[in-house]
């Protein structure tokens, strides 16, 4: 019997044994990386312990990364048919939470009892765009507040009838886009089905911060795992080209470069005034795969100081290195780690995940070594580097680890309610913004330089 069948068999047995909360399935959106697997297991134990103390039975708690062997289950939609087939006969509600989301089960039951379980319901804390957003393909740009999507940190819920309809649709339809970019906005669009399905119902008890009546709340986006890793543990590679030497590069130097232990600018030409390093790869208008693979080869060589971590960014990426070093303390550099903002391609049909390049790609030395020794390579210099790397890691069984603190776009492209509660690590693009002001407002930590 496989591990996954054994786990699912145990969960079903527990479901049948309990009462009271037995109609609730809690899905923790867990990840395969060892740190996140431990955190989600701790959250599961907390939920079950709380249920035992309250004496109202216990819910089923599913760790999403254990549901099946498919890594793409993180994007939720591919997992819904399996979730319904496994638990649909027993459950009335499916609650989706982050590993740092806390539940108050008694309050949650009171909330769910307000909504007839035989109807289609999509519940959560509503977010909406503050303006036209590129990451949402400018959907509802004429009235951004007219469409709401769930705040993932507060959790969200679907009733059994809605889950059933979604599961059936997913087995017979293709998605309009092959890309998974902003997961919860895309889920809300799929549920809404251009007016044929329900919109999100705002539930005040689904909270990002704890209040007296909250059924859910969120602990932290930036966990405290101890002292930040040393500056010298992170090697920073900035991709640039000649036409941006006097435009974008000065922004990097005026903002976050001073917080780096080791940093190099890689360009198509050498410029001693910066300085930049030419890797012998011609500049391309897009993709940059050839340049990125050359950076990784250089990182493993003796040409640069040895470091446990490699951060690859664009020259128009803004970064908080102090927060990144805090986050990296949570991860084991002896493992193959690929960390950043996770996107997906073709995930409904066994596609692959990747760390989007604009927000910054963080790779452990072990991950870089495995990638470069695997034979994976670019089919052209202008191939999309982040997607090629993601496809390679998928073939190697290296999970892509997501952090919502990395951002492929500008602050204006995200819901203000969401990013105002974060301690962001990165934003991307200088278009229509003052990058110095963005860095100062969103990323700069007011600490003495020797404490960063």
List the model feature ranges, each with a label.
Residues 1-452:
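Secretory-pathway lumenal glyco-enzymes, predominantly type II signal-anchor Golgi glycosyltransferases
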């Amino acid at each position: 019997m496989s591990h996954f069948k054994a786990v699912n068999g145990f969960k079903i047995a527990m479901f049948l044994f309990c009462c009271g909360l037995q109609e609730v399935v809690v899905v923790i959106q867990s990840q395969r990386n060892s740190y996140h697997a431990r955190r989600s297991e701790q959250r599961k134990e907390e939920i079950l312990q709380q249920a035992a103390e309250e004496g109202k039975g216990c819910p089923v708690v599913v760790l999403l990364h254990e549901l099946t062997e498919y890594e793409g289950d993180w994007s939720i939609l591919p997992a819904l048919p399996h979730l319904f087939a496994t638990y649909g006969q027993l459950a009335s509600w499916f609650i989706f939470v982050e590993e740092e989301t806390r539940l108050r089960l008694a309050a949650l039951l009171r909330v769910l009892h307000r909504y007839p379980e035989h109807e289609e319901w999509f519940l959560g804390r509503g977010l909406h765009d503050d303006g036209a957003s590129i990451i949402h393909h400018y959907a509802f740009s004429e009235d951004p507040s007219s469409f709401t999507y769930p705040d993932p940190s507060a959790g969200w819920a679907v009733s059994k009838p809605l889950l059933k309809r979604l599961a059936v649709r997913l087995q017979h339809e293709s998605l309009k886009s092959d890309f998974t970019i902003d997961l919860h906005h895309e889920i809300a669009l799929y549920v809404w089905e251009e007016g044929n399905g329900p919109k999100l119902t705002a539930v005040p008890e689904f909270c990002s911060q704890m209040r007296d009546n909250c059924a859910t709340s969120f602990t932290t986006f930036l966990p405290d795992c101890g002292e930040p890793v040393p500056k010298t543990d992170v090697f920073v590679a900035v991709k640039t080209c000649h036409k941006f030497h006097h435009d974008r590069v000065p922004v990097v130097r005026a903002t976050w470069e001073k917080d780096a232990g080791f940093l190099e600018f890689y360009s198509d030409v050498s410029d001693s005034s910066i300085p930049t390093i030419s890797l012998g790869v011609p500049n391309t208008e897009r993709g940059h795969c050839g340049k990125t693979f050359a950076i990784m080869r250089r990182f493993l060589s003796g040409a640069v100081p040895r470091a446990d971590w490699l951060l690859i960014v664009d020259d128009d990426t803004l970064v908080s290195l102090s927060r990144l070093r805090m986050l990296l303390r949570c991860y084991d550099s002896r493992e193959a780690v690929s960390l950043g903002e996770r996107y997906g391609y073709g995930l409904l049909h066994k596609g692959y995940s990747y760390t989007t390049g604009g927000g910054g790609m963080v790779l452990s030395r072990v991950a870089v070594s495995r990638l470069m020794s695997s034979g994976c390579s670019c089919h052209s210099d202008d191939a999309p580097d982040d997607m090629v790397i993601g496809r390679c890691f998928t073939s190697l069984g290296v999970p892509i680890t997501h952090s919502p603190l990395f951002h492929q776009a500008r602050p204006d492209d995200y819901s203000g309610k969401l990013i105002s509660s974060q301690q962001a690590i990165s934003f991307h693009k200088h278009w229509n913004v003052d990058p110095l002001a963005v860095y100062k407002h969103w990323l700069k930590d007011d600490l003495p330089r020797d404490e960063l």
